[in-house]
Design a protein with these regions (language model features):
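Active-site microenvironment of metallo-dependent hydrolases
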Residues: 1-175
Length: 175
């Protein structure tokens, strides 16, 4: 049934974005401190904004189902990213878009690319796609074989680590 197909493959519908979409609502802002090899976080204090020297970048959740324009942006430490952005639609528990980035323009490019892919995982640097995996089925699954999917995920991880993501952090599942 074509209506079912559309409902399954058209689930990534964020409102139109600009780099201003990722502005912090207040400063200083609390920092979420990652713990290596875990999903547990700590209070990392406060910071005025992105500070690469202190390993502080932006982390945003972008509503993707109803184009509400709801975006929550915080600061993140312990991820290691030195440039670019990493984004995914595989984001337990809500599966909204999660994007971590050094620059608002790369974060915007990453979210826009996920919309074009109808979901997935993407690594962006200086506005260019470094690596990606389309997950058009609900923003969570692909039509690719398990072998091809595993290969793409390995390339995504390598790309994220090449931009500085710490070796003790899974670039996507940690988000």
């Amino acid at each position: 049934d074509s209506s079912l197909s559309g409902r399954i493959t058209n689930t990534v519908n964020p409102a139109p974005l600009s780099k201003e979409s990722f502005a912090l609502k207040r400063t200083p802002e609390y920092v979420i401190q990652l713990t290596p090899w875990q999903i547990i976080t700590k209070n990392g204090g406060k910071a005025a904004g992105v500070d690469i020297d202190r390993d502080i970048i932006k982390l945003s959740v972008v509503e993707r189902f109803k184009s509400t324009g709801h975006i929550g942006t915080a600061l993140l430490s312990g991820y290691g990213l030195k440039r670019g952005a990493v984004a995914t639609t595989v984001a337990h528990d809500s599966h909204n878009i999660i994007v971590a980035g050094v620059s608002d323009s790369d974060m915007t490019a990453a979210v826009n690319r996920l919309k074009e892919l109808r979901g997935g995982m993407v690594v962006i640097d200086n506005g260019k796609i470094i690596s990606e995996l389309a997950l058009p089925l609900g923003g969570l699954m692909t039509f690719l074989s398990a072998y091809e999917t595993a290969d793409r995920i390995n390339k995504l991880r390598d790309a994220a680590h090449s931009l500085g993501v710490s070796d003790n952090i899974d670039p996507f599942m940690t988000l």
